[in-house]
Curated annotation (Swiss-Prot):
GO terms for cellular component: chromosome; PML body. Disruption phenotype: Progeny of mutant females display widespread morphological defects and cell death and early embryos have asynchronous mitotic divisions and tangled chromosomes. It comes from the Eukaryota. Residues 176-191 have a biased composition (Basic residues). Residues 17-119, 176-202, 217-266, 279-318 are annotated as: Disordered. Keywords: Chromosome, Nucleus. Pfam families: SprT-like, Zn_ribbon_SprT. This is Germ cell nuclear acidic protein. Belongs to the serine-aspartate repeat-containing protein (SDr) family. One of its GO terms (biological process) is protein-DNA covalent cross-linking repair. It comes from Danio rerio. It is found in: Nucleus; Nucleus, PML body; Chromosome. SMART domains: SprT (SM00731).
Amino acid sequence: MDPGTLSLFQRVSTKLGWDRDGGLDDAEEKLRKSLKKTRRPALASSDSSTGPAQRLELSDSDNSSGKENRSQEEHILLTSDDEDFEKFLASKATPKSTFKQSASSAQKPREPVPVLSSESDNEFELFLNRVKTPKAKVQPQSMSSSDESLKHFIVDSMSSDDDFVTEKKPSIYKGKAKTVKTPKSVQKTKKPAPSLCNSPVFLSDSDDDCNIVIKSTWRTRHSRPPSDEHQATSKDREETEKPRVPQPTITVKSHTSRDDTCSSEEEFQSLLDRVRQNLGGRTSASPMPSAEPKPQRPCLSTPSATGRKTGSQVPVKDSPVIHTPVQQMPSSRPVLSHTEPRALPNSRVVVCKTPGCFLQSLSAPGSVYCRSFKQNKDELTSKLYQLYNTSVFDSQLPVDMSVTWNNKMRKTAGYCISGQERGTGKRYARIELSVKVCDSADRLRDTLIHEMCHAATWLINNVRDGHGPFWRLYARKAMLAHPELPMVSRCHSYDINYKFQYQCNRCKNTIGRHSKSLDTTKFVCALCTGQLVLLTPSKPRAPTPFATFVKENYGSTKQELTGQSHAEIMRKLSADFASKTRLSQS
């Protein structure tokens, strides 16, 4: 202890009289008595209820104020010299008034006697009789889960219950049954007799609560555990404790999530069986297997999405669950063999029903129009225009619309020019296609229908909306008429085939050109200012026979025609080459 603190403690002890003999002991005794007085109201309003013959012992230490879920060996000790406080606890040992109780339990005086609410149980019994879905296997599970819940819901009479009281959830804490247990049986987690229960167990009769026993821990008050995990743990607890203690005679029945799940699955299965029987009666499908009751699996899945049908013609109790194999289920889908090749997900297997349609063949590399596209592209363009005009646009476009090829378009596949004549006011449209981009039959097929949709919006609907609703309408109509067409999109994604490729020697970026017009001495890479190098140089052409003849005979002919011009020498060489060629051919 530092000198400043020591001097301060000496002054305080001198002022309060602690420096005298026995002064500190007297101060300690006063402090203990003041603490006992302040904690008695909290204990009087606690949740724990005691029996008439119960003996509570007070301890002098604060460690006895254990919180809600203590270990099994821990006891609640109170001092035995405070008999008035024991009487006060015995008169006030009832459940808290914040929880909603039934009308019968609210009218009774506060006495430490076990009170059972049977009104909600009778209503639930009537509901079970209406639904008629008793589960023989689920009821022991429900009883065991209710008994197991008594172990985990231990409410100690200490100040930690105050935060539990503030949780006001009337829809969750609806009291189903209230019993009284001795504290010893609660803390040692043994199954008590039905008439000796002192800790109230709050169950919920709503579907969302899934009959989860409300444990007095912070985690369970602020977050609800999953229903599947709770069901699995309650099942394990039931299996471990079955051989030890027999089942109690008095049970608290509640609408559990397991009952709801099983009954919902049974009703859904019976509905599915009736649908299958109806389908089997109308179609000549394979016979249904004989209805034999099969052992049911434990119902651990989530409830079915199908609504509950209480007024069904065939009760769920009398109809056995039939598991029909998938192969015998009647279906309208064609049965596919595992040996035949399966179509790719992106492939379109729909066959075009338009007469005279040849669009599918344009994607095959071996077709006539694909092999000799450059020679037959004008003929193919005319045939495609007539086919689209009749099948998609109902021959509303002009037959002689201008469709030309443009050599200057380097990246745009095509465009439609629309207008109106000045004198007559007649609307017109013409289409131009790029020679450098539409260099194959399938690209011509896809680009032409795109531009014809633009022309139709202007010539038929008198609308210029770009890629608006009218254009999308004609695009969808084209895909319905010709399913083999790809999606008619706004922009193309073609990889343009350039004749010449330039590459940067620093960042390896490539630039495409249709001609060898890029001067590498003047232009550099736009990304890193590196030097550009031509990747695909032009192939050297072999010299022609006339060039070879001129190279061999130019010197001798020039000597013969001394003083003559170059033109006269070339005329002489041309005449000699022509005479030589005629002699060789003859």
